Amino acid sequence: MPEGDAVFLTARRLDRALAGQQLTRTDFRWPSLATVSLAGATVLRTATHGKHLLTRMQHDGRELTLHTHLKMEGRWRTIDVGRKWPAPVQDVRVVLTSAQKEAVGFRLAIVELLPTADEHTVIGHLGPDLLATDWGEEHETEAVRRLLADPDRPLGEALLDQTTVAGIGTIWLAETCFVSGVNPLAPVTAVKDPVRLLRRARQMLRTAVKESRPVTTGDKRNPLWVYRRHREPCRRCGTTLVAGPIGDEGQQRTTYWCPSCQPEVGGDP
């Protein structure tokens, strides 16, 4: 599933193609919106909150938001008008066309149109967005409060829970826990400095946006410390990395760690 940085970069691409432009045609291949036309609407911008995309526009004197979510297989592509779509037609869920550019949403998991004033109904339950441009002390305090709300919960589960903080997926879970010296299966109480851990997660996400790809080691040739490096040597100590499931049965994800650098108890963020 695309994580917060990838969704943020998707929003940037949509903005480059459509922000400030008037839509000449729209096509919603989604049952609840099949008869909707937003032709004539002016796209303002696409914002994000964690893994959620919020394309805001003005139409007939109203401010509307197109809320989409990529989940596992969804993606947005922007192309010149008239160019062939880069994926099968049957996968198309949304088409937004301006005079020169077209944004096509493939296999989107969520597509809904709502008044911009009602965005809280679809993202209000989420934790603070680690890539929020106005991130400040208030966001950090709330993120820490949510993280510590269930101190016995496995840290990895808490970080993957978008109601704790928004934007972390399996990449940033594994990498944040590694650089913080905490095992992802350890309880939240194993984190000695939750503020520092969250700041590290935020900085890594910001770096990924800057580099347009996840890079946590500082080396673009070997960009990640532990993610998807099961059975490979730790880049720090040489110990063989391990992988294991995290989360409730039926919703388990795979995470990665170093048994030496990330003991099951303790940690030193």
Residues covered by each model-derived region:
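Structured catalytic/nucleic-acid-binding cores of DNA maintenance enzymes
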Residues: 1-269
